[in-house]
Amino acid sequence: MALTKTINIDGKEVTFRASAAIPRLYRVKFHRDIYKDLDALQKAMGGSDENASTLDTFSLELFENISYVMAKHADPSIPDTPEGWLEEFNTFSIYQVLPQIIELWGLNVQTDVTTKKKLRATERPMTTALFLLRCIQIGLSIRDLDLLTIGMVNDLYAESRNDECQDSYRQLASQEDFDAF
């Protein structure tokens, strides 16, 4: 289930879409890791105070690229390049748009895994490569990624690694079961 959010930018309503496919789409388009880029942007932005931020030209380009991928994912009819898309606006304020995109991304990444599951905690930060590896390990297709949030993928991965959950799903089918099917 992908999440969407409509943001008014320069008097134009723009829809952004966050789904589990975004890390892959971003990596394919820009050859970068969206998790690392969002983390760098959040640190550089320094809250909502424009004077406290350390945004440079590279940070602005990251922001534009992330915004573009999420907008293109919501509306395939927008131009095929970030530059073409940005030409549609007179102003595109990072301080107006980025907090809302980060909020949308945060909702997409939320997970429902409960603490009662006996999983080993990991100190490994989530990266696009790790996320895609987990998708492969649980057998998800690109079509599946478009329908799931990242939190849902993490839940599926956690349950696939949880022995208690795996035991409850293990059932052997008899010939009678196949005949009845």
Language-model segments: which ranges?
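Charged interaction scaffolds used for protein-protein
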Residues: 1-13, 20, 32-61, 73-181
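Covalent nucleotidyltransferase core used to form phosphodiester bonds in nucleic acids
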Residues: 24-30
